[in-house]
């Protein structure tokens, strides 16, 4: 919410499987407790979405969550979306099949996608000092090197 461009690789149609962080952490805990040694367990959220769709959902959710009189609303816009050159070898789709972890361990995501986005945004609102720290200095240089100079 700084009014900066929102870089999107390629055409933004790369697909990823999205999972709320607490659900991911719970899956890891359950694998440690109940998983079989040497086995691999895929953790997925059954939420395959295109990157551009995620950005649009985040923008829409921010506008829903910010009060009408909040000055930060002016800094949230789909007009900030900027398409940048795709990375070489960038996978078009990551597909996760979490059937095994559900069958063997009983794990499945509990948080609905939209609720996870809202919780994530709320966390960032509650930790604005942290946000200021990671968007300055070394992190900012990394961001500029990765996205703004493409």
Language model: regions and residue ranges:
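C-terminal substrate-binding subdomain of Rossmann-fold SDR/epimerase-dehydratase oxidoreductases
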Residues: 1-150
């Amino acid at each position: 919410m700084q009014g900066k461009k929102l870089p999107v690789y390629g055409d933004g149609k790369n697909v990823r499987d999205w999972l709320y962080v607490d659900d991911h952490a719970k899956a890891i805990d359950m694998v440690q407790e109940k998983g079989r040694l040497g086995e691999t367990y895929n953790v997925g959220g059954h939420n395959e979405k295109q990157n551009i769709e995620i950005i649009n959902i985040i923008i829409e959710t921010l506008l829903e969550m910010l009060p009408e009189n909040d000055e930060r609303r002016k800094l949230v816009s789909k007009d900030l979306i900027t398409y940048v050159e795709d990375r070489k070898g960038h996978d078009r789709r990551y597909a996760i099949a979490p059937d095994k972890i559900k069958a063997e361990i009983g794990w499945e995501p509990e948080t609905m996608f939209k609720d996870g986005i809202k919780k994530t945004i709320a966390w960032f609102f509650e930790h604005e000092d942290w946000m200021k720290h990671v968007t300055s200095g070394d992190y900012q240089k990394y961001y500029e090197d990765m996205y703004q100079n493409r």
